[in-house]
Amino acid sequence: MNAPKYYIAVFGDPKPPEKDAIESGVYHPDIKFAPFRNKPGDFLLLYCTGSYAEHAMRVPGIGVVLEATNSEIRYRYLPLSETASKNDLDDKLDPADKAKFLNIRFSSHWLFEISRQSFLNIVADRGVLWP
């Protein structure tokens, strides 16, 4: 079994059925970034842009990838006990991942890989609310 990979999934304003809410467990990344290399067991930091009113500029939870195609990623949504702010990401992402994160202004539904350490830096001091 391969080690999981870690990603930031950027969510803009949810507009089903093409763009879903983070709690739905379905993510439709911008197709121009396909193919998506996610595999079951990979982890997503679910970041909401300023246009996502309910969770603006925050990471309210993580996703564990269940399956991925060229148009959508299905995941198990797990809320965090305390959301992570954009400032938390700016402070805790490693330099290479922070440089990628600065490019979110180009797409409100962008998916990009980050290091395991960056992922842990964000979630380490927060609990995951298991159902």
Where does each model-flagged region fall?
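Short coil-to-beta transition motif at edge beta-strands of beta-rich domains
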Residues: 34-52
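Compositionally biased, charged N-terminal/linker segments
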Residues: 1-40, 113-114, 119-131
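Aromatic- and Lys/Arg-enriched surface recognition patch
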Residues: 56-131
